[in-house]
Amino acid sequence: MGTRYFLVGFLILLVLGFEAQGAHVPQQDEASSPALLTKMQKSLLGYWDTAKAAAHKLYKKTYLPTVDEKIRDIYSKSTAAVTTYAGIITDQVFSILSGED
């Protein structure tokens, strides 16, 4: 019983600590923030487009149907496994937090 309350209390204090740290951030100038954000967004989108185009070219150059089929099979199996284990972990966390024995 004590460890459950300790875990819940620890998580609450952790969240409150992060909220308190975020509260002391000084306010930025409203006029300069959107321009900087826009520049960063355009730059990141440019990098993303370049990387996506390079990956697409590499994929087209090295495309093999058997490898593609194996990759799709591995992807479907791994996502099924991750979904299963995520469900198990979610159930365990819910069980710990709700206090069911």
Swiss-Prot record:
The keyword Manganese does not apply. One of its GO terms (cellular component) is low-density lipoprotein particle. It comes from the Eukaryota. The keyword Secreted applies. Coiled coil: none annotated. Proapolipoprotein C-II is synthesized as a sialic acid containing glycoprotein which is subsequently desialylated prior to its proteolytic processing. It is found in: Secreted. Residues 1-22 form the signal peptide. GO terms for molecular function: phospholipase activator activity; phospholipase binding. Residues 78-101 are annotated as: Lipoprotein lipase cofactor. Keywords: Chylomicron, Glycoprotein, HDL, LDL, Lipid degradation, Lipid metabolism, Lipid transport, Secreted, Sialic acid, Signal, Transport, VLDL. Gene3D superfamilies: Apolipoprotein C-II. Its main location: secreted. One of its GO terms (biological process) is positive regulation of phospholipid catabolic process. Residues 66-74 are annotated as: Lipid binding. Belongs to the apolipoprotein C2 family. Component of chylomicrons, very low-density lipoproteins (VLDL), low-density lipoproteins (LDL), and high-density lipoproteins (HDL) in plasma. Plays an important role in lipoprotein metabolism as an activator of lipoprotein lipase. Both proapolipoprotein C-II and apolipoprotein C-II can activate lipoprotein lipase. This is Apolipoprotein C-II. It comes from Capra hircus aegagrus (Wild goat).
